[in-house]
Amino acid sequence: MGHTSYAVVDLETTGNQLDYDEIIQIGITFVSNNKISGTYHSMIRTDLDIPPFIQALTSIEDTMLEQAPYFHEIAQEIYKQLKDRVFVAHNVDFDLNFIKKAFQNCNIDFKPKKVLDTLELFKIAYPTDKSYQLSELAEAHDIPLDNAHRADEDATTTALLMIKAFQKFEQLPIDTLKQLYYLSKNLKYDLFNVLFEMVRQHENSPLDNQYGQFEQIIYKKQIDLKAPKTSFNGSLKDLYSEVVKSLNLTYRPQQLYLSEIILEQLMHNDKAMIEAPLGSGKSLAYLLAALMYNIETGRHVMISTNTKLLQNQLLLKDIPSINQALNFKINATLIKSKSEYISLGLISQILKDETTNYEVNILKMQLLTWIIETETGDIQDLNLKGGQKMYFDQKIETYVPVRHDMHYYNYIKRNAHHIQIGITNHAHLIHSDQENSIYQLFDDCIIDEAHRLPDYALNQVTNDLDYSDLKYQLGLIGKNENEKLLKAIDKLEQQRILERLDIAPIDVFGLKMNISEIHDLNERLFNHIFEIIQNSDVYDDDIHRHHYVFEFDSTQILKDLHLIVDKINKTLEIFNGMTHKTIKTLRKQLLYINDTYRNIEQSLKDKHTAYLSIRNLTQKSTIKLIVKDYAVRDILTTRVLDKFNSLTFISGTLTFNHKFDAFKNWFKEDVHFNTYQVPSTLSNHANTNVYIPSDVSSYNFKNIDDYVASIVDYIQEYVTITDSKCLVLFTSYRMMHMVQELLNELPTFEDYVVLTQQQNQNYKIVQQFNNFDKTILLGTSTFFEGFDYQAKGIKCVMIAKLPFMNKYNTKHWLMDSEFDSTFKDYVLPDAVTRFRQGLGRLIRNEDDQGLIVSFDDRLVSSNYKNFFAQTLENYKQKKGDIKQFSKLVNKIQHNIDANK
């Protein structure tokens, strides 16, 4: 690394508006030779008020800056610290622009010669990290960060992560390092200087035996599984007792009972539905049952979970714990569809692609660092999003495998006979059709969080025509001979002429004209769809922020689709008999696009359920046409029920009105299921109150202002007494934002952080909610699925409305043909399940103090109130006005304070 010196900078500011906000803290950590060589830190005085959100985030209050210097008083000192060093920051634009502006105000022209963005660096060095927020990076890489969002600690943490990334790069094989260097020239900042020094100083040594080489790619070799050596002389009860004792867990008869039930289904090839309450230890129960079954019969067991989080918990925590307890080595692995695994030939093609787009360039570098450490080749590890995902998906679709290709899915197939427990998720389980031979090796399956299975099945029964996706796919072909694949074809024809290649002549002009016409026909199709939307009744479910048209005439759409499909077919005829790789790639891309149009055309001809979606009513680019091709019941029957001899469905919420009938309705009628309800380990919810306000009028759209004002009154009463956090759940964004506006206007909430749910930001918001003491989280009904609600005092959830899906929710429309009464058979059970899930996850143990406030009096006064009674029967229920609510909260708070 030579003698390069780095200044790793972190700033805290009063906000993110460069023209208005000011720096309130600076932290600098100096790095030389991969070691921290010093630090600099100062609070900075400002005449601006520090907003409550910034105070909560940074723990910096106005009083802490009273004795601090203004920036101009220490500007020269800071400038001297920075001027001859590489300027480094995490998301460097923010810090660099703020400090440049601060220097500019002091008549100092600060222009660092070299700049490094650790956000860019960490994406390349740590390609599988779920998040590149500093606090999460620190946690993932075991670097202490006690006070996130304090400049001094953040700067040091960033520096330590940077050093770790540098050290990782220095250990890479020289061929990988060189490729990273060449690619880094297309980055925004100066990482290429760092990599150049590493290449220059790299010791040339033979390639380590743990690595292999495919063309120019260095990859980590896979180690085949060994035959399992797991044996146990004793019963399942003995196995359970030994594991519980060894791991110092509580012996729970209900947990053993659950495990015994599951083993019985496996041994007798039965199909069962089991309701086991949250907190009953389901994971350990079914893992031990699967292990015992494998020991006694030698047969594999598939376990399907709802989330990647639970998959990782099973593979990285629960199974290793059992191995430790029994001194075993259980062969358990993740099972997915073939398309979810990488091939080295695909990576090679991506690296050879001349695309210099910034995100694609980052992806190329990520692939190089990932493939040298992955043992599975699981594409999902890369957490691809946005443009990267679109690009990658297109490359998969158009990839023509080379003969000597190495596909990571073959490792799973090769080792399948040694796998004892396969772990998958609901989406892959349902998506896995006949092409996934690996699933056919499993005769027995346990499905956890089974209540979510129909949602995943619903995702598999639709096809869509997406304007933005089709525009992107057609764009990859190009519109003239100077663009994308058309450019490659034109180049091939020039080579044929100049080098006399032994291939048939290509009608480049005719091809270009056809492709141009396909572009125009696509625009015409979506112009017609846009016109239909503008002239139709448009509905909004107020959750997904999309607009929908459910009833429309598809005559013109079918005519347009026919013209496009016909034109693509005629274009494909140009390539008849041609086998060159470039032509194969273009042909495959055209076939992919053609299939998209053709499938929708056939579905509309067959009068399948369909609807139009548009995210922005003024933008054609946000249009989708969605059609339903299969019944959810058929998908669940053929892809789940008929696939396994033994099948066990487990969830904390499988019953509706104390019966399994609603869940049974998802499958064909002639199947017998054994049904079990495991008693809860929490005998009652004595510490939890359900409160129904009597002074809030029943909701209707005419009284929404009064309804919202009542919700805010109760929130205000609660926080005034407890001085603590609160979660408020809504079924519409409109009502949520109305409450937010009122909260922001009231002085009571000046020192509170009001968080509102944003799409794709749930994880981040939950983290903030759990980290802050004085915060209010406003979320939609997606939070009814629950999360790890952390609170020092009362866990309070206020429910604006029960979690019924909006009547304009697309699920409602798609499922209407599958039930005699969509409300009674689908919507109501779904609402009750969501309600039960939310409450069940709120109260996790006997010590939790819970308060649930339901403003929706349908909970106790509607025709279907009895269906919610199953959820509430173990809770204390109270009804009263806001004064009685105040007394109840005071009483609960007094009890908590007395027990401290």
Curated annotation (Swiss-Prot):
Record-linked Pfam families: Helicase_C_2, ResIII, RNase_T
Name the UniProt record assigns to this protein: 3'-5' exonuclease DinG
Ranges for domain Helicase ATP-binding: 241-496
Family of this protein: Belongs to the helicase family. DinG subfamily. Type 2 sub-subfamily.
Principal EC category: hydrolase
Gene Ontology terms describing biological process: DNA replication proofreading
Enzyme nomenclature, EC number: 3.1.-.-
Keyword field: ATP-binding, Exonuclease, Hydrolase, Nuclease, Nucleotide-binding
Domain Helicase C-terminal: 713-893
Keyword Nuclease among UniProt keywords: yes
PROSITE patterns per the UniProt record, alphabetical: HELICASE_ATP_BIND_2, HELICASE_CTER
Amino-acid positions noted as binding ATP in the UniProt annotation, renumbered to this chain: A276, P277, L278, G279, S280, G281, K282, S283
Keyword Ribosomal protein listed: no
Motif DEAH box location, chain numbering: 448-451
GO cellular component: cytosol
GO molecular-function terms, A-Z: 3'-5' exonuclease activity; ATP binding; DNA binding; DNA-directed DNA polymerase activity; helicase activity; hydrolase activity, acting on acid anhydrides, in phosphorus-containing anhydrides
Role noted for this protein: 3'-5' exonuclease.
InterPro entries reported for this sequence: ATP-dep_Helicase_C, DinG, DnaQ, Exonuclease_RNaseT/DNA_pol3, Helic_SF1/SF2_ATP-bd_DinG/Rad3, Helicase/UvrB_N, P-loop_NTPase, RNaseH-like_sf
Matching CDD domains: DEDDh (cd06127)
Domain Exonuclease: 8-161
Recorded name of the encoding gene: dinG
Source species, domain of life: Bacteria
